[in-house]
């Protein structure tokens, strides 16, 4: 996205020591261990060797690499072997403004530690992080540093962690008006600026979200949780439901979101409901403009949120009970084929 910022290592998970969800694979299992005790030493080597429907099973360890699952690897499952995402870490440190070896810059999407372009992908029991830090690169202007680039349909991310600073998770629809759905359950997501963003339909269900402190004084600006750029033709954008947001930042220093408006058809849709919000949220006005585009022109709403960061008033649009029945994980993800990963 437009100018933003970097990453680091945190602890935390959506559900401690949880067993991984069943994968959707029907083919082989390819094993990975960086000590050479498995068939492959790197995660990408196993992905390259995998066919559609295979499972890549990753042993405990830290893997310093970028990974890319192309569209042809439909139905691939990436699974941490222990079931605890803190044990299996895939990490890298590119930013949008990082120079590429062959010339040019990576750009926002290209900065991702992990890119999943295939449909029907399942990711479970891993940590994916981008450790690029603003403070270490004061000369870099484009500070977006993506951990996860999710750009396929019917993708599931379960019991996993996604950690960066700016633009942690990109929920992307390569064809803006087409159907791209991504489901996150029992995950942990951390960042500071626009760190859940994009134009896909994405549901964050029973996740833990950490707003990372950038050191702003009370009442200042530490950052923004979300920045959707949903196409105007789509009924649903990003939904955060039944989740917990926490932060060590000072009170009133974080916005819940702002509308990313890269083109005339991007309006931004975001609903946060039944979620615990921390004191770090700007309770009087949690939404803000972006690039001259008013948040009031987007579709931002809340419903039944709790915690010290919850509130009401003219600057906090609320769904009615009737409207809330259409803003559920099921309704967002059903699409034209009735997909229901919540079962």
Feature locations, PLM:
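N-terminal low-complexity, Pro/Thr-rich disordered segments
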Residues: 1-31
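Sequence-level preference for short, compositionally simple segments enriched
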Residues: 26-343
């Amino acid at each position: 996205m437009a100018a933003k910022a970097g990453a680091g290592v945190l602890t935390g998970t959506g559900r401690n020591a949880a067993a991984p969800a069943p994968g959707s694979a029907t083919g082989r299992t390819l094993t990975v261990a960086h000590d050479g005790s498995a068939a492959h030493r790197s995660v990408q080597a196993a992905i390259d060797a995998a066919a559609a429907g295979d499972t890549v099973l990753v042993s405990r360890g830290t893997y310093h690499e970028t990974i890319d699952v192309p569209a042809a690897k439909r139905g691939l499952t990436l699974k941490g072997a222990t079931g605890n995402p803190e044990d299996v870490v895939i990490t890298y440190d590119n930013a949008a403004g990082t120079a590429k070896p062959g010339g040019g810059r990576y750009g926002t999407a290209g900065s991702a530690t992990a890119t999943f372009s295939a449909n029907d992908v399942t990711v479970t029991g891993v940590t994916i992080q981008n450790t690029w830090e603003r403070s270490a690169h004061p000369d870099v202007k484009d500070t977006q540093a993506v951990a996860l680039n999710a750009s396929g349909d019917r993708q599931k991310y379960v019991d996993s962690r996604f950690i960066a600073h700016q633009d942690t998770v990109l929920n992307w629809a390569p064809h803006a008006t087409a159907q791209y759905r991504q489901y996150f359950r029992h995950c942990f997501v951390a960042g500071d600026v626009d760190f859940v963003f994009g134009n896909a339909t994405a549901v964050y269900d029973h996740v833990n979200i950490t707003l990372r402190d950038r050191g702003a004084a009370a009442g200042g600006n530490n950052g923004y949780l979300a920045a959707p750029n949903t196409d105007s033709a789509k009924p649903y954008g990003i939904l955060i439901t039944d989740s917990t947001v926490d932060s060590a930042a000072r009170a009133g220093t974080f916005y819940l979101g702002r509308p990313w408006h890269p083109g005339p058809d991007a309006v931004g849709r975001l609903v946060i409901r039944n979620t615990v919000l921390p004191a770090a949220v700007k309770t009087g006005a949690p939404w803000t403009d972006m690039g001259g585009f008013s948040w009031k022109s987007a579709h931002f709403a809340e419903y039944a949120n709790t915690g010290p960061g919850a509130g009401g008033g003219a600057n906090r649009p609320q769904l009615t009970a009737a409207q809330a029945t259409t803003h559920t994980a099921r309704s967002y993800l059903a699409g034209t084929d009735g997909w229901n990963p919540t079962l």
